[in-house]
């Protein structure tokens, strides 16, 4: 019997197989509006209220490294990445459940610090930490957060729904989280080298990361774009499709297009990249645009709106219009600063099983 | 600065510390009725509907051993233990979210098999597998399931609510899951010995476990007591307090008493123990009562009802009345078959951090 390694098929085809197996279970619950394949599941609670639900698992050495991550920040990030998924449905977060698998080396104080980070983020977003589960772990720390949010049926936004002619918008700036990660990894290597060579690692040899504060903060303490959800509601704009950028702009735009049955054309010179991100890319001899397209973990919102809504968002400093939705036949492309058009589907985002 | 190992304070005091940190976040969400400290969080959706939500994390080598656990059974069990938490609130399960951290050694076929077990259980309970998250893992498999259920405000049952004079009831039989686990562990040892000695391990040397089918099934494929929730509703009985037996009767009865501010007196000769469980205990020179009191993982329901409801449940073959709720001052005790009264608080259930 042939056995297939998961990395042979990758994360998204694995999710496809999982969806197929889960499919027959959906019939039991007629109020379910949307199952696997979006940022959240969506189900009807009443004629005026939908709930959305999401879960994210964070694994030591895969999603974080405690050598470079203050544990309180990690707690905050675990909340933020789930809030970001709720925001991607144009919904407001309400309740969080936290599951932990805790290695033997962890102390009570470390768990308290982790929860203080979660508490801080929960208070920021106005959500309740309402329950959870704790277990021991034979290996590293595992954090699984599940979150329930609410949205009016007229406001909910799925990945599908983009139409040719819609504008492609993105919040904030991209690539910063990837830049921050590269800096932290470099710093970790320097630290480990010093330890290996029995040399002191202290403030004298540590890089001054103060000037790269923003990028490191983007990596360690990302904030979900709850204010964008509120802004869009205040402006009376309902996006036709939305996703949060967790895998990278390229991959996440492809999710919108494949589920909407469309293509897209975006423009390099409109992609918001922070000056600091460009500086870090220069210093590390890397490409800031690649970080923006494939770095992931920016937790910005990528959404599409009908063209006639552009006036309603153009005064927002936080939203950039980076391109347009096209017919599927036109493909998914980016024009570079020289006017060349490049196929975006050749540029992949993060895949947990193919790294 | 003094650092405390988690095993010094144990699982329940750790949860206490977590609750304190989470407490301030509860104020943001006035619809939240019950936070950390019960089998589920409870929140109001409308005047006629509450939702309950729970999460359970299953970790390789802590909660399961793939040497003795068919992976499809594991999928089914991951669903059942969450349904059991929903049932403990007297609620009906609706939606499940599944998070997996998958080790590199896992194949696509193994994940499909895991999900087929989940699908099987989901169809059995009538719940939708509505979403999830997949990640790689540097070590063992981690499964985190979160589940949302529904209950009418007049039916919801918390751990608190037991009153002196109430009858203490339990469904099914206890200790079977512990008996099954001991058998599987013995079989694993025999297998590993054979492998170590380069001797074949095949059907000729494998123990015939057919006669212990029920106990092994209790361990590998427990079923949540959804039919008890339906039965109680049909009978018009609302338990005053309820919990599912995941840590063991002793520990879980103490949870009801501490949250209700009561004591309890139960009777050894009324505790339902399957004949097969007693046989296995004899064979392994262990004590079946200890398994029933502290073995855990039986996923039966432990609940209390007003004395005048006893007539409504006495025709159920699945429910045993094992004792009575008392004033707090009387403590929490068990009378043995010789009439001796023993303090139950000295008999501890499973603690993830003190094993």
List each language-model region with its residue ranges.
Chain A
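Glycine-/charge-enriched secondary-structure boundary and capping motifs
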Residues: 2-26, 69, 103-130, 135-143, ...
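Phosphate/diphosphate-binding glycine-rich loops and adjacent basic-rich segments that engage nucleotide
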Residues: 153-220
């Amino acid at each position: 019997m042939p056995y297939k390694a998961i990395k042979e098929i990758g994360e998204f085809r694995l999710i496809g197989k999982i969806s197929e197996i889960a499919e027959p279970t959906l019939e039991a619950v007629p109020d379910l509006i949307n199952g696997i394949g979006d940022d959240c599941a969506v189900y009807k609670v009443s004629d005026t209220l939908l709930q959305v639900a999401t879960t994210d698992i964070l694994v030591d050495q895969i999603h974080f490294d405690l050598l470079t991550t203050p544990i309180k920040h990690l707690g905050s990030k675990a909340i933020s990445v789930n809030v970001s998924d709720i925001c991607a449905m144009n919904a407001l977060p309400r309740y969080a459940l936290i599951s932990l698998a805790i290695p033997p080396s962890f102390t009570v104080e470390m768990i308290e610090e982790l929860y203080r980070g979660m508490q801080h983020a929960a208070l920021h977003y106005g959500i309740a930490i309402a329950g959870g589960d704790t277990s021991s772990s034979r290996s590293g720390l595992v954090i699984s957060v599940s979150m329930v949010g609410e949205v009016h049926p007229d406001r909910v936004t799925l990945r599908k729904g983009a139409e040719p002619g819609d504008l492609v918008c993105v919040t904030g700036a991209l690539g910063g989280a990837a830049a921050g990660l590269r800096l932290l990894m470099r710093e970790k290597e320097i630290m480990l080298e010093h330890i290996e060579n029995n040399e002191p690692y202290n403030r004298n040899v540590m890089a001054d990361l103060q000037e790269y504060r923003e990028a490191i903060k983007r990596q360690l303490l990302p904030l979900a774009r709850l204010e964008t959800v509120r802004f869009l509601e205040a402006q009376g704009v309902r996006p036709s499709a939305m996703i949060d950028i967790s895998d990278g702009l390229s991959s996440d735009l492809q999710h919108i297009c494949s589920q909407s049955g469309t293509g897209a054309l975006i423009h390099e010179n409109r992609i918001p990249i922070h000056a600091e991100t460009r500086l870090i890319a220069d210093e590390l001899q890397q490409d800031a645009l690649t970080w923006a397209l494939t770095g992931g973990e920016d937790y910005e919102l990528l959404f599409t709106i009908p063209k006639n809504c552009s006036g309603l968002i153009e005064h927002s400093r936080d939203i950039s219009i980076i391109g347009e939705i096209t017919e599927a036949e036109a493909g998914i492309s980016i024009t570079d600063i020289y006017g060349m058009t490049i196929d975006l589907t050749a540029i992949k985002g993060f895949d947990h099983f193919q790294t």
